[in-house]
């Protein structure tokens, strides 16, 4: 089974594209098996949270990082799990 890695994704997103367009920077930590999966997760999350299309999101860099460098508490807690059991 593959090991889940932590990626830091940096980029810009276009906020309020119809009235006063403004490009804002973002930095997100994502857990994924591959770089491509991390990109898809970022596109999906930003698109659903901010109602953005993919053309309104510019990815500048995707880096694999050590779990010790992560600042997001949710990612830290997920990384510390040894196993995950889904019930129901």
Swiss-Prot record:
Pfam families (UniProt xref): Ribosomal_L18A
Gene Ontology cellular-component terms listed: ribonucleoprotein complex; ribosome
HAMAP family on file: Ribosomal_eL20
Domain of life: Archaea
UniProt entry keywords in alphabetical sequence: Ribonucleoprotein, Ribosomal protein, RNA-binding, rRNA-binding
Recorded GO MF terms: large ribosomal subunit rRNA binding; structural constituent of ribosome
Subunit structure: Part of the 50S ribosomal subunit. Binds 23S rRNA.
Entry protein name: Large ribosomal subunit protein eL20
Gene Ontology biological process: translation
């Amino acid at each position: 089974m593959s090991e889940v890695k932590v990626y830091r994704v940096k980029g810009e997103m276009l906020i309020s594209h119809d009235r006063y367009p403004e490009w804002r920077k973002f930095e997100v930590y994502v857990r994924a098996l591959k770089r491509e999966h991390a990109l898809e997760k970022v596109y999906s999350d930003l698109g659903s949270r901010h109602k953005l299309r993919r053309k309104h999101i510019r990815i500048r860099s995707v880096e694999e990082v050590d779990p010790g460098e992560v600042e997001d508490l949710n990612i830290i807690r997920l990384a510390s799990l040894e196993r995950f059991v889904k019930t129901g």
